Amino acid sequence: MKIKNQLLDGLYDHQKDKNDKLSKEQQVEIVEKLLKSVDLAPGVAEMYPHELSGGMKQRVAIAIATSMEPRVIVADEPTSALDVVVQRNVMQTLGRLQEGLHASIILIGHDMGLVAQFSDHVGVMYAGRLVEVGPVKTVFKSPKHPYTRLLIQSLPTLSNKKDFIGIPGLPASLLNLPEGCAFCLRIGQVTSTKIPWVNVAKDHFIQDCKKCADYGKK
Protein backbone atom coordinates (compact mmCIF):
# COMPACT_ATOMS: atom_id res chain seq x y z
CA MET A 1 0.00 0.00 0.00
CA LYS A 2 1.36 3.41 -0.93
CA ILE A 3 2.14 5.95 1.76
CA LYS A 4 -0.67 8.28 0.62
CA ASN A 5 -3.24 5.51 1.10
CA GLN A 6 -1.95 4.75 4.59
CA LEU A 7 -2.20 8.43 5.51
CA LEU A 8 -5.77 8.70 4.20
CA ASP A 9 -7.06 5.44 5.70
CA GLY A 10 -7.14 6.81 9.23
CA LEU A 11 -8.97 9.94 8.13
CA TYR A 12 -11.65 7.91 6.34
CA ASP A 13 -12.06 5.57 9.33
CA HIS A 14 -12.78 8.51 11.64
CA GLN A 15 -15.16 10.40 9.38
CA LYS A 16 -18.60 11.05 10.84
CA ASP A 17 -20.20 10.48 7.45
CA LYS A 18 -18.63 7.45 5.76
CA ASN A 19 -20.21 8.46 2.45
CA ASP A 20 -18.49 11.86 2.46
CA LYS A 21 -15.61 11.20 0.05
CA LEU A 22 -12.70 13.58 -0.40
CA SER A 23 -11.97 14.88 -3.88
CA LYS A 24 -8.61 14.01 -5.44
CA GLU A 25 -7.50 17.60 -4.95
CA GLN A 26 -8.42 17.45 -1.25
CA GLN A 27 -6.59 14.14 -0.85
CA VAL A 28 -3.42 15.54 -2.41
CA GLU A 29 -3.62 18.66 -0.23
CA ILE A 30 -4.09 16.67 2.99
CA VAL A 31 -1.32 14.17 2.20
CA GLU A 32 1.15 16.90 1.27
CA LYS A 33 0.31 18.82 4.44
CA LEU A 34 0.87 15.74 6.62
CA LEU A 35 4.16 14.89 4.91
CA LYS A 36 5.36 18.47 5.21
CA SER A 37 4.56 18.44 8.93
CA VAL A 38 7.18 15.69 9.40
CA ASP A 39 9.70 17.16 6.94
CA LEU A 40 9.06 14.71 4.11
CA ALA A 41 8.81 15.65 0.43
CA PRO A 42 5.45 15.37 -1.41
CA GLY A 43 6.93 12.63 -3.61
CA VAL A 44 6.98 10.26 -0.64
CA ALA A 45 3.20 9.93 -1.07
CA GLU A 46 3.69 7.72 -4.13
CA MET A 47 6.30 5.49 -2.48
CA TYR A 48 5.91 2.14 -0.72
CA PRO A 49 7.20 1.42 2.81
CA HIS A 50 10.06 -0.79 1.58
CA GLU A 51 11.43 2.19 -0.36
CA LEU A 52 11.83 4.31 2.77
CA SER A 53 14.66 4.45 5.30
CA GLY A 54 14.00 3.65 8.95
CA GLY A 55 13.84 7.33 9.85
CA MET A 56 11.42 8.09 7.01
CA LYS A 57 9.15 5.22 8.06
CA GLN A 58 9.06 6.58 11.59
CA ARG A 59 8.18 10.05 10.30
CA VAL A 60 5.30 8.58 8.29
CA ALA A 61 4.10 6.80 11.44
CA ILE A 62 4.21 10.13 13.29
CA ALA A 63 2.23 11.80 10.48
CA ILE A 64 -0.44 9.09 10.73
CA ALA A 65 -0.54 9.36 14.53
CA THR A 66 -1.00 13.14 14.45
CA SER A 67 -3.34 13.35 11.45
CA MET A 68 -6.44 13.52 13.67
CA GLU A 69 -4.86 16.13 15.98
CA PRO A 70 -4.96 13.93 19.11
CA ARG A 71 -4.67 15.28 22.65
CA VAL A 72 -2.53 12.30 23.74
CA ILE A 73 0.15 10.59 21.64
CA VAL A 74 1.49 7.19 22.74
CA ALA A 75 5.03 6.72 21.41
CA ASP A 76 6.18 3.13 22.02
CA GLU A 77 9.93 2.85 21.34
CA PRO A 78 9.75 5.56 18.63
CA THR A 79 13.50 5.49 17.96
CA SER A 80 14.10 1.74 18.13
CA ALA A 81 16.73 0.51 15.63
CA LEU A 82 17.59 4.06 14.51
CA ASP A 83 21.06 5.60 14.70
CA VAL A 84 21.74 8.43 17.15
CA VAL A 85 21.44 11.30 14.63
CA VAL A 86 18.15 9.99 13.20
CA GLN A 87 16.86 9.36 16.74
CA ARG A 88 17.36 13.00 17.61
CA ASN A 89 15.73 14.24 14.40
CA VAL A 90 12.69 12.00 14.92
CA MET A 91 12.27 13.11 18.53
CA GLN A 92 12.63 16.78 17.57
CA THR A 93 9.91 16.32 14.94
CA LEU A 94 7.66 14.64 17.49
CA GLY A 95 8.33 17.41 20.01
CA ARG A 96 7.55 20.14 17.48
CA LEU A 97 4.23 18.51 16.57
CA GLN A 98 3.41 18.04 20.24
CA GLU A 99 3.81 21.78 20.85
CA GLY A 100 1.74 22.64 17.78
CA LEU A 101 -1.08 20.33 18.84
CA HIS A 102 -0.79 21.17 22.56
CA ALA A 103 -0.79 17.42 23.12
CA SER A 104 0.74 15.18 25.76
CA ILE A 105 3.16 12.40 24.80
CA ILE A 106 3.46 9.13 26.67
CA LEU A 107 6.97 7.96 25.74
CA ILE A 108 7.51 4.24 26.33
CA GLY A 109 11.10 3.05 26.15
CA HIS A 110 14.13 1.45 27.76
CA ASP A 111 16.65 4.09 26.59
CA MET A 112 17.19 6.03 29.81
CA GLY A 113 19.22 8.70 28.04
CA LEU A 114 16.37 9.39 25.62
CA VAL A 115 13.85 9.49 28.46
CA ALA A 116 16.02 11.93 30.42
CA GLN A 117 16.40 14.22 27.43
CA PHE A 118 12.83 14.38 26.14
CA SER A 119 10.55 13.82 29.16
CA ASP A 120 9.24 16.07 31.91
CA HIS A 121 8.00 13.30 34.20
CA VAL A 122 9.02 9.66 34.33
CA GLY A 123 7.45 6.47 35.63
CA VAL A 124 9.72 3.45 36.12
CA MET A 125 8.10 0.02 35.79
CA TYR A 126 9.29 -3.36 36.99
CA ALA A 127 7.40 -6.58 36.15
CA GLY A 128 4.52 -4.54 34.74
CA ARG A 129 4.13 -2.39 37.85
CA LEU A 130 5.09 1.20 38.50
CA VAL A 131 7.74 1.42 41.22
CA GLU A 132 8.80 5.08 41.01
CA VAL A 133 7.18 8.23 39.60
CA GLY A 134 8.40 11.80 39.57
CA PRO A 135 9.87 14.77 37.68
CA VAL A 136 12.55 13.40 35.37
CA LYS A 137 15.33 15.62 36.74
CA THR A 138 14.51 14.66 40.33
CA VAL A 139 14.34 10.93 39.61
CA PHE A 140 17.60 10.88 37.66
CA LYS A 141 19.44 13.02 40.21
CA SER A 142 18.14 11.18 43.25
CA PRO A 143 16.58 7.78 42.40
CA LYS A 144 14.98 6.16 45.43
CA HIS A 145 13.82 2.74 44.25
CA PRO A 146 16.64 0.17 43.89
CA TYR A 147 15.59 -0.82 40.37
CA THR A 148 15.65 2.82 39.21
CA ARG A 149 19.02 3.24 40.88
CA LEU A 150 20.48 0.23 39.06
CA LEU A 151 19.06 1.34 35.71
CA ILE A 152 20.67 4.76 36.02
CA GLN A 153 23.96 3.26 37.21
CA SER A 154 24.00 1.15 34.05
CA LEU A 155 24.14 4.24 31.81
CA PRO A 156 27.59 4.56 30.19
CA THR A 157 29.38 7.87 30.75
CA LEU A 158 32.78 9.25 29.74
CA SER A 159 33.78 9.62 33.39
CA ASN A 160 32.75 6.14 34.53
CA LYS A 161 35.70 3.76 34.13
CA LYS A 162 34.31 1.05 36.43
CA ASP A 163 32.79 -2.25 35.35
CA PHE A 164 29.04 -2.24 34.99
CA ILE A 165 27.26 -4.42 37.51
CA GLY A 166 24.26 -6.43 36.39
CA ILE A 167 21.17 -7.18 38.46
CA PRO A 168 21.31 -10.69 39.94
CA GLY A 169 18.57 -13.28 39.71
CA LEU A 170 15.82 -13.68 37.14
CA PRO A 171 12.88 -11.39 36.34
CA ALA A 172 9.61 -12.23 38.06
CA SER A 173 7.12 -14.27 36.06
CA LEU A 174 4.25 -12.06 34.92
CA LEU A 175 2.00 -15.11 35.23
CA ASN A 176 2.78 -15.52 38.92
CA LEU A 177 3.54 -12.14 40.45
CA PRO A 178 3.73 -11.92 44.24
CA GLU A 179 1.30 -9.79 46.19
CA GLY A 180 4.26 -7.86 47.55
CA CYS A 181 7.41 -6.48 45.95
CA ALA A 182 8.33 -8.23 42.67
CA PHE A 183 11.86 -6.80 42.72
CA CYS A 184 12.63 -8.57 46.00
CA LEU A 185 12.65 -11.88 44.13
CA ARG A 186 15.75 -10.70 42.23
CA ILE A 187 17.74 -10.41 45.44
CA GLY A 188 16.47 -13.47 47.30
CA GLN A 189 13.85 -11.73 49.43
CA VAL A 190 10.10 -12.35 49.69
CA THR A 191 7.30 -9.97 50.64
CA SER A 192 3.69 -11.06 50.88
CA THR A 193 1.96 -7.78 51.71
CA LYS A 194 1.02 -5.00 49.34
CA ILE A 195 3.71 -2.33 49.14
CA PRO A 196 2.55 1.23 49.96
CA TRP A 197 3.31 4.32 47.92
CA VAL A 198 5.38 6.95 49.74
CA ASN A 199 5.92 10.61 48.85
CA VAL A 200 9.71 11.13 49.12
CA ALA A 201 9.89 14.63 47.59
CA LYS A 202 7.70 17.10 45.70
CA ASP A 203 5.71 15.08 43.13
CA HIS A 204 8.15 12.18 43.69
CA PHE A 205 6.67 8.83 44.79
CA ILE A 206 8.05 5.30 45.20
CA GLN A 207 6.84 1.84 46.14
CA ASP A 208 8.41 1.75 49.60
CA CYS A 209 9.66 -1.81 50.19
CA LYS A 210 11.85 -1.96 53.30
CA LYS A 211 13.48 -5.27 52.33
CA CYS A 212 15.09 -3.97 49.15
CA ALA A 213 15.24 -0.21 49.81
CA ASP A 214 19.03 -0.05 50.25
CA TYR A 215 19.94 -2.44 47.45
CA GLY A 216 22.24 -0.89 44.84
CA LYS A 217 23.30 2.06 46.98
CA LYS A 218 26.93 3.03 46.55
Feature names for model-found ranges:
Residues S67-R71:
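A short, proline-enriched helix->beta-strand linker immediately N-terminal to the Walker B motif
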Residues M1-D13:
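Q-loop/switch helix immediately C-terminal to the Walker
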Residues Y12-Q15, S23-G43, I152:
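Conserved ABC ATPase "signature" region
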